[in-house]
Amino acid sequence: VEWTDGERTAILTLWKKINVEEIGAQAMGRLLIVYPWTHRHFASFGNLSTPSAIMSNDKVAKHGATVMGGLDKAIKNMDDIKNAYRDLSVMHSEKLHVDPDNFRLLSECITLCVAAKFGPKEFNADVHEAWYKFLMAVTSALARQYH
C-alpha cells in the first residue's frame, strides 16, 4: 500500500486520539451483537445471549482492547503491514479458523465506533477515507494466509 502524506497524517493523528480500551470494547460488542454467528469463535467468553450481556462482558472488552492495541503494529509498520501481520494471519487461518470476512466486519464496527466518538468535524470525509484504506490494508494482511 502506498500512502500519501495526507493519508499518513490523517491516520496517525486519529490514532493518537483513540482510546483502544473504549473503542475496542464497543467495536467487539457491536460485532457480536450485529453478527451473532461470530459467537462461535468466542465460546470461552461466557454469556453472549443478549446485547446487554455482551456489552457488559469483561472478556469481550478485553479482547476488543487487544484487537485495537494490535492495530498499533500496523501503525508502526504502515509501509509493510502484510509482513507485520504474517504471524497473526497464520494463527487466525490455521489455528483459529476464522472466516476472513470477519476481519472486514470488525473493521466496519471499528469505523462506526470511531465515527460516533469523534463526529464529522474530526472524522471528516478525508479522514474516513484514509482510515478505511488503513483498515482494509490490515484486513488484507490478516486474510493473506487464506489465499
UniProtKB/Swiss-Prot annotation:
Q: Which GO terms describe its molecular function?
A: haptoglobin binding; heme binding; metal ion binding; organic acid binding; oxygen binding; oxygen carrier activity; peroxidase activity
Write out the residues that bind heme b: H63, H92
Tissue expression notes: Red blood cells.
Q: Which residues form the Globin domain?
A: 2-147
**Keyword Metal-binding appears in the UniProt entry:** yes
Any idea which UniProt keywords this protein has? Answer: Heme, Iron, Metal-binding, Oxygen transport, Transport
Give the CC-aspect GO terms. blood microparticle; haptoglobin-hemoglobin complex; hemoglobin complex
Q: Which SUPFAM superfamilies match?
A: Globin-like
Q: Please give a single GO biological process term from the UniProt record.
A: hydrogen peroxide catabolic process
The record, for Gene3D superfamilies, names: Globins (1.10.490.10)
Q: Which PROSITE patterns match?
A: GLOBIN
Q: Which protein family is named in the record?
A: Belongs to the globin family.
Other known facts? This fish has two hemoglobins: cathodic and anodic. Cathodic Hb has high oxygen affinity, low cooperativity and displays a small reverse Bohr effect. Anodic Hb has low oxygen affinity and cooperativity and displays a normal Bohr effect.
Q: Which PANTHER family does UniProt cross-reference here?
A: HEMOGLOBIN FAMILY MEMBER, HEMOGLOBIN SUBUNIT BETA-1-RELATED
Quaternary structure, per UniProt, is: Heterotetramer of two alpha chains and two beta chains.
Outline what the protein does. Involved in oxygen transport from gills to the various peripheral tissues.
Q: Please report the name of this protein according to its UniProt entry.
A: Hemoglobin anodic subunit beta
Upper lineage is:
Eukaryota, Metazoa, Chordata, Craniata, Vertebrata
